[in-house]
Amino acid sequence: MQSITEKIDIKALTLEELKASLKIIGEKEFRAKQIYEWLHVKLVRDFEEMTNLSKELRAKLASEYELICVNDLERYESKMDGTVKYLFRLSDGNVVECVLMKYHHGNSVCISSQVGCRMGCRFCASTLGGLTRNLKTSEMLDEVYQIQRLSGERVSNIVIMGTGEPMDNYDNFVKFIRMISSSDGLNISQRNITVSTCGIVPKMRALAEEGFAITLALSLHAPNDEERAKIMPVANSYQLQDVLNACDYYYEKTGRRVSYEYSLVDGVNDTAACAKELSRLLKGKNCHVNLIPVNPIKERDYKRSTGNNIQNFKNILEKNRINVTIRREMGSDINAACGQLRKSYTDKTMVQEVNL
């Protein structure tokens, strides 16, 4: 039950929800369309910027609603490829990171779905501090909005592959998809949105029923349960065959080809035997494998595969008629891999606090 003093998160309201909410406070329904456009098209950060509303209405909105925005904390631009890494501060002081990647086909942003992550994948910097909390729908939206504001360029593609497991924040993530792709908002095509999961089977199946046209990317990283469990604790909860069945179900329901993400770790999952086993596992599936040279993490004793091993792995998959690419590295000179910048910032902050 909402307390008397708690304000409503206006940015997390759909247009229909906003209409209903405004009616409760005695405002006309047509105002909802105006306000929604200010929030989700013009991307304003303050009610005072809504200049076609009366001063009285703006004051009323400020008293009834909370306008949640993320704030630019640090920003780094790659000298290699123009990739921009953003560190955003949330209203409670937590920080999240996002990446803007510029391609010839448009601008793509990688956003976070949680502050930290509880999945514990051994090769990922995001999990080192555990999970702090879920991001609100409004915060996920404003990650995209803030990047578009700061860059001055339209965002056309979104990958939800930053910090966090989206399926562990399912309701907020699903509402984010509906709102970011709404024709009343930024209207980003669902076909240009990709969500990554480590394999939470019930939520994957639920996502297949949502009627979305987004791409599902599975963080696979090993060709069998035994090896997968060594680097991904989630494998102890969901058997690989059940995860793959959920991927097949997603393809059946949506017609969208599933992408399998495979981070190559030297001496762990990059052998020819692993490549052959992976080929057998995915044989006959309409899918794509994305090979990722793992980013070294000083807290883990994992190293990226050699260039020869990466190419050999790819060749074996291709010989077995598996669609495969090696992910292009972007922003490697600015710690653009998931979790690296946030961790560097929090480590630095902790050192400063200790030295006070």
UniProtKB/Swiss-Prot annotation:
Superkingdom to which the source organism belongs: Bacteria
UniProt entry keywords in alphabetical sequence: 4Fe-4S, Cytoplasm, Disulfide bond, Iron, Iron-sulfur, Metal-binding, Methyltransferase, rRNA processing, S-adenosyl-L-methionine, Transferase, tRNA processing
Similarity section: Belongs to the radical SAM superfamily. RlmN family.
Residue numbers annotated as active site: 97 (proton acceptor), 338 (s-methylcysteine intermediate)
Localization annotation: Cytoplasm
S-adenosyl-L-methionine found in the keyword field: yes
Main location class: cytoplasm
Alphabetized GO MF terms: 4 iron, 4 sulfur cluster binding; metal ion binding; rRNA (adenine(2503)-C2-)-methyltransferase activity; rRNA binding; tRNA (adenine(37)-C2)-methyltransferase activity; tRNA binding
Gene that this polypeptide is encoded by: rlmN
Record domain Radical SAM core: where: 103-333
Other information: Reaction proceeds by a ping-pong mechanism involving intermediate methylation of a conserved cysteine residue.
Record's protein name: Probable dual-specificity RNA methyltransferase RlmN
Primary enzyme class: transferase
CDD domains listed in its UniProt record: Radical_SAM
Sequence positions that bind S-adenosyl-L-methionine: 164-165, 196, 219-221, 295
Residues that, per the record, bind [4Fe-4S] cluster: 117, 121, 124
GO CC terms, sorted: cytoplasm
Protein's job: Specifically methylates position 2 of adenine 2503 in 23S rRNA and position 2 of adenine 37 in tRNAs.
Catalytic reaction(s) noted: adenosine(2503) in 23S rRNA + 2 reduced [2Fe-2S]-[ferredoxin] + 2 S-adenosyl-L-methionine = 2-methyladenosine(2503) in 23S rRNA + 5'-deoxyadenosine + L-methionine + 2 oxidized [2Fe-2S]-[ferredoxin] + S-adenosyl-L-homocysteine; adenosine(37) in tRNA + 2 reduced [2Fe-2S]-[ferredoxin] + 2 S-adenosyl-L-methionine = 2-methyladenosine(37) in tRNA + 5'-deoxyadenosine + L-methionine + 2 oxidized [2Fe-2S]-[ferredoxin] + S-adenosyl-L-homocysteine
EC number: 2.1.1.192
Disulfide bonds: 110-338
Cofactor: binding details: Binds 1 [4Fe-4S] cluster. The cluster is coordinated with 3 cysteines and an exchangeable S-adenosyl-L-methionine.
Organism lineage: Bacteria, Bacillati, Bacillota, Clostridia, Lachnospirales
PROSITE patterns: RADICAL_SAM
GO BP terms: rRNA base methylation; tRNA methylation
Cofactor: [4Fe-4S] cluster
